[in-house]
């Protein structure tokens, strides 16, 4: 590992204390880039790695909503817009009780590279809230999503940042978010992906990631002169990829 990479990893840990998930992914990614960095000294001069590991913008906001019992609830919301070098920020929204800046930064940082590999002009970002949708009624989820979008709408747009779903955020939640966005800005535009078919969504969207994993695995095996026949597949964490 180059001295420059080591310094950047340590700097990231110092600037983001206690965010272990973010530390881990930064260390893994930057370590893998060492051969490239050593061959391109101009990257260090341009502080490329420092810029990659620092979000272009980070927003933390309060989400106030009312539950079915009429009690006011308060959650935290986040949106980290990591990198827009090749296009608008793109990345999901996660609703889970363990969501905090470290997880959102970890996911947003990885999203830069995942999106660039598609060949599409999209940057990387991620967002979410510590809201737990489990056990909540449809009406509670709707009110929460509306409260999120009431703050989030000012930070997103079809040419700025296009969120999607993630853990705890499926077609229902995207629909509630999109409805509130339209209500506020009075425009029907491509600001969220993962919508239902009646609201401009795409057929096969929910299955796309799962199929993509299989096709990607097939291509990796093919590149090494192998195929899927008789292979044993281990699945560790599938979130919303599996539909029964």
Q: Where would I find each of the regions flagged by the language model?
A:
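Glycine-rich Rossmann-fold phosphate-binding loop(s) that bind the pyrophosphate
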Residues: 238
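Short helix-loop-beta connector
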Residues: 226-230
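Conserved small/polar residues in nucleotide/adenosyl-binding loops
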Residues: 242-244
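Hydrophobic Val/Ile/Leu positions in short beta-strands of Rossmann-like dinucleotide-binding domains
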Residues: 233-235
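N-terminal ligand-binding/catalytic initiation module
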Residues: 1-203, 207, 216, 220-223
């Amino acid at each position: 590992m180059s001295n420059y990479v080591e310094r950047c990893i340590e700097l990231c840990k110092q600037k983001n204390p206690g965010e272990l998930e973010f530390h881990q992914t930064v260390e893994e990614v930057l370590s893998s880039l060492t051969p490239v960095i050593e061959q391109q000294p101009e990257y260090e001069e341009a502080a490329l790695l420092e810029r990659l590991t620092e979000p272009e913008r980070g927003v933390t906001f309060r989400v106030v909503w009312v539950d079915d019992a009429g009690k006011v609830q308060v959650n935290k919301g986040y949106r980290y817009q990591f990198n827009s070098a090749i296009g608008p920020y793109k990345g999901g929204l996660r609703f889970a009780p363990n969501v905090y800046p470290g997880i959102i930064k970890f996911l947003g940082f990885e999203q830069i590279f995942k999106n660039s590999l598609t060949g599409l002009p999209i940057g990387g970002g991620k967002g979410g809230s510590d809201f737990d949708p489990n056990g909540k009624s449809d009406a509670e989820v709707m009110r929460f999503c509306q409260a999120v979008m009431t703050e989030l709408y000012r930070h997103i747009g079809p040419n700025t940042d296009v969120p999607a779903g993630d853990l705890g955020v499926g077609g229902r939640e995207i629909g509630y978010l999109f409805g509130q966005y339209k209500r506020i800005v009075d425009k029907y535009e491509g600001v969220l992906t993962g919508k239902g078919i009646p609201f401009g969504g795409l057929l096969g969207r929910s299955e796309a990631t799962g199929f993509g994993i299989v096709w990607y695995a097939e291509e990796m095996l093919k590149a090494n002169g192998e195929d899927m026949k008789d292979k044993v597949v281990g699945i560790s964490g599938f979130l919303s990829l599996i539909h029964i």
